Amino acid sequence: MTTATPDIRPLTIPSSLNAPEAADFLEMVRVRNIVYDEISGNRDEELEPAVILPHYQPSPFEQRLIWGVWSGDEFVGRAGLDLPHDGDATVAYAQIELRRHAWSRGIGSTALGILEAAARAHGRRVIESWIEHPTAAGEQVTPPTGYGQIPLDHAARFALRHGYALEQVERKSILNFSATSMAFVADLHQQALGAAGGYDVVSWHPPTPREFVADYAWMKSRMSVDAPSAGMEIAEESWDAARILEHDTHWIDGGRDVLVVAARDRASGRLVAFTELASSPGTP
């Protein structure tokens, strides 16, 4: 069997989905969705092109590089490198996503070499990545924190073979709506009310109301480093009104239905906690 040499080249990001140069971007999104379906066996991670496109438009806060991966005439995956402009800007975030039938052909290793070279060219000395690992039996890999583990699956073996180390496990949880689960949520809600006497709840849909922008920006900055990150190098993100505006614009332009809920401390009047709930067009 003859294996085609992979063709890995930068993708042109169109200004709109109707632009003549949008074909490769649309194919990238289609294949991206297939890749996540192959990983998890469901469509939970599926996103529409309109949702993804705003996040690849030029931004003063982050540069996003993306390559398409072809095997012959077939688009089989993508490779991406995110370059935040926060702090000392020493970290790059990498991703390699390939169709399952393109595994074990050296394509991923070739793509990784391109990403590492690009990271060095942009002055980055650390590459970090988040990889989805469905739960599976067999040999496991445990991070230094001792919390959680992942199966030694294809993606884990690839990362370890190339000198990367598992630093932290983040758990993905799913809540299926049912009478039982909603009763459980209602009970948690009552418990929370009993412990949250000094707070009010406020909520909004983008764009963020002017009176909440400063506190929302402060919370976004703090959560970038306050959230557990084990030994990973995380620079604090700098959020201000301009970045909140871009953040909101991405949600709005992508057509996502977003609800932001925040806790406001009654004594100070400041927002002190928040959560974001987003759903995509056509996703139940």
Q: What do these predicted ranges mean?
A:
Residues 1-7, 112-210:
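Acyl-donor-binding surface of acyltransferase catalytic domains
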Residues 1-55, 61, 195-242:
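Short amphipathic alpha-helix that is part of the acyltransferase structural core
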Residues 21-24, 104, 148-151:
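Residue-level preference for long, well-ordered alpha-helices that form the structural scaffold
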Residues 32-144, 148, 264-284:
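Conserved donor-binding loop and adjoining core beta-sheet/short helix segment
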Residues 221-229, 253-256, 268-272:
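Short helix-capping and hinge/turn segments at secondary-structure transitions, especially at repeat
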Residues 227, 241-260:
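Amphipathic alpha-helical hairpins
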